[in-house]
């Protein structure tokens, strides 16, 4: 067998990503559209018995759209598809050729503008046509991209790829556990698998699982069939973590079904995924769902989906925040009075991992006005203030109008005299001190373990550390022995009843407490 080699699709060029925040700093509404050229289209061919290797088209297309973000996403960036994540261990000696197509990712957090999305879809599809013939397709998706006039864009991509390929070429897709998955996707994708962990730690595992199944499908060992069953429950991800009940037990049941199958159906269950969904994407598909891939039996896939959906529905009242929570004032008071030497506060309403603007100064203002000593806010997206800091220089004092340059619905910028502590040129960011509070300005950093060092900051030097996320990600839990999630306002508000939903499914729990759901009524 020939080893894996990378084959570049013809006539494809890509430009580097221009960051959204840089464009905003220049006064633009979003980053400019970056275009990838594709080659001429060809008609699909059946796999050739004379070719030395099976050709697998690989690409990524993902976004966690926050429709409550005040600014539309009007552009995509087109990074060169990195085939390294597709160099799977299960493919090492399989004699496959990886054919990288165009990958596309929106450059902002808000609802994707329809024209830009349509162009991105056409670029990806054009690169697929230019790469034909192929024997299979492997896509890395998210599942929560939402575009004006298009809807669930990732699902639309799979549908349109199926139209190009015809019915026989297998398509494998991996998803984030927080995807909002349309039921119709199962008609077009063959192998559909999502994360089983939140916080996510199993990306490599699900890629290997999908890759193994795709290889089996290419070789004719399996005939994958998928089924998707929506469950009318809409929750913030912080109420559905696989480290806590009830999702931990529900995911264990999904794993058991993969091992043992479903009663009364001899067909093997190849993959079973429970999706939490993304609550900040207001769409008809928003919410929990079950995705099953079975070997040759839609009935078995449906039965497994019904079983898991019923278990989820029965547990709907058990979902709760998996960490300590508090309103802003109370949370800060608890942190200051805590016996623990350090406390991590997360600004959940402006949680950048939920595609918020990341520019709200609400927590910073509160800490400064309360004269809190030894606090670190990491960080606030604000390229204008960063520019002023660079103009002033390290050690200088400068008047700043911090934050609220995108998100203006929750209060004005925070006006303050700040001392410039550190400038980091390659990140175009600045650390400043206001009273006893140090804050990092620039991109909306999540505050992961590797983020602090370039600024000369050590989280252990502070009693209170604030980051713009919800639950703790791997590594963040080492910052402090105690974590309090602040229930702050913003586009990522954990209090979903404070958000203005227009398109979500109705009835849905917990919005409609008396919502009814019968999984047995799922289409055959």
Question: Where would I find each of the regions flagged by the language model?
Answer:
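N-terminal secretory signal peptides
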Residues: 1-12
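C-terminal segment of N-terminal export signals and the immediately downstream linker at the start
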Residues: 11, 32-55
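N-terminal export leaders
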Residues: 13-27
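N-terminal amphipathic/basic leader segments beginning at the initiator methionine
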Residues: 47-93
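Active-site histidine-anchored catalytic micro-motif
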Residues: 57, 62, 114-118, 131-223, ...
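Metallocofactor- and cofactor-centric catalytic cores in central/energy metabolism, strongly enriched
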Residues: 59, 64-71, 84, 96-129, ...
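Hard-cation-handling environments
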Residues: 238-435
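Extended hydrophobic packing segments that form well-structured cores
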Residues: 313, 426-524
């Amino acid at each position: 067998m020939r080893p894996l080699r990378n084959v570049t699709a013809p006539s494809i060029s890509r430009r580097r990503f221009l960051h959204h925040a840089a464009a905003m700093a220049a006064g633009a509404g979003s980053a400019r559209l970056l275009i990838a050229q594709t080659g001429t289209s060809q008609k699909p061919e059946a796999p050739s018995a004379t070719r030395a290797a099976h050709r697998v088209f690989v690409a990524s297309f993902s976004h966690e759209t926050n429709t409550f973000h005040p600014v539309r996403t009007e552009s995509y960036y087109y990074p060169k598809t990195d085939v390294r994540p597709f160099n799977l261990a299960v493919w090492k000696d399989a004699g496959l050729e990886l054919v990288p197509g165009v990958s596309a990712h929106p450059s902002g957090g808000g609802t994707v503008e329809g024209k830009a999305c349509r162009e991105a879809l056409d670029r990806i599809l054009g690169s697929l046509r230019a790469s034909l013939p192929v024997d299979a397709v492997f896509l890395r998706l998210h599942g929560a991209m939402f575009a004006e006039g298009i809807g669930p864009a990732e699902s639309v991509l799979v549908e349109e790829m199926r139209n190009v390929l015809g019915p026989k070429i297998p398509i494998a897709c991996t998803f984030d556990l927080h995807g909002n998955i349309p039921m119709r996707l199962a008609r077009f994708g063959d192998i559909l698998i999502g994360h089983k962990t939140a916080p996510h730690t199993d990306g490599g595992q699900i890629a290997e699982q999908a890759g193994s199944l795709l290889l089996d499908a290419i070789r004719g060992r399996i005939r994958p069939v998928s089924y998707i069953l929506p469950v009318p429950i809409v929750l913030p991800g912080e109420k559905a973590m696989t480290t806590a009940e009830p999702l931990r037990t529900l995911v264990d049941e999904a794993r058991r079904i993969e091992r043992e199958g479903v009663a009364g159906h001899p067909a093997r269950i190849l993959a079973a995924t429970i999706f939490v969904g993304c609550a900040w994407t207001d769409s008809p598909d928003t919410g929990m769902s079950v995705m099953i891939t079975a070997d040759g039996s839609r009935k078995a896939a449906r039965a497994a989906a019904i079983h898991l959906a019923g278990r989820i529905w029965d547990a709907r009242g058990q979902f709760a925040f998996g960490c300590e929570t508090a309103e802003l004032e109370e949370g800060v008071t608890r942190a200051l009075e805590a016996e623990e030497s350090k406390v991590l506060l997360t600004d959940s309403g402006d949680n950048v991992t939920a595609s918020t603007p990341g520019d709200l100064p609400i927590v910073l203002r509160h800490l400064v006005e309360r004269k809190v000593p030894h606090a670190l806010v990491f960080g606030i997206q604000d390229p204008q203030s960063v520019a002023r800091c660079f103009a002033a220089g390290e050690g200088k004092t400068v008047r700043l109008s911090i934050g609220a340059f995108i998100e203006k619905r929750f209060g004005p910028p925070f006006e303050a005299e700040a001392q410039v502590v550190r400038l980091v040129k390659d990140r175009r960011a600045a650390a400043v001190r206001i009273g006893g509070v140090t804050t990092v300005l620039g991109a909306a950093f999540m505050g992961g373990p590797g983020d602090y060092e370039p600024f000369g900051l050590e989280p252990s030097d502070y009693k209170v550390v604030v980051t713009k996320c919800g639950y703790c990600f791997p590594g963040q839990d080492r910052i402090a022995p105690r974590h309090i999630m602040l229930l702050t306002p913003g586009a990522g508000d954990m209090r979903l009843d404070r958000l203005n939903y227009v398109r979500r499914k109705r009835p849905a729990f917990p919005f409609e407490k008396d919502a009814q759901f019968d999984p047995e009524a799922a289409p055959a």
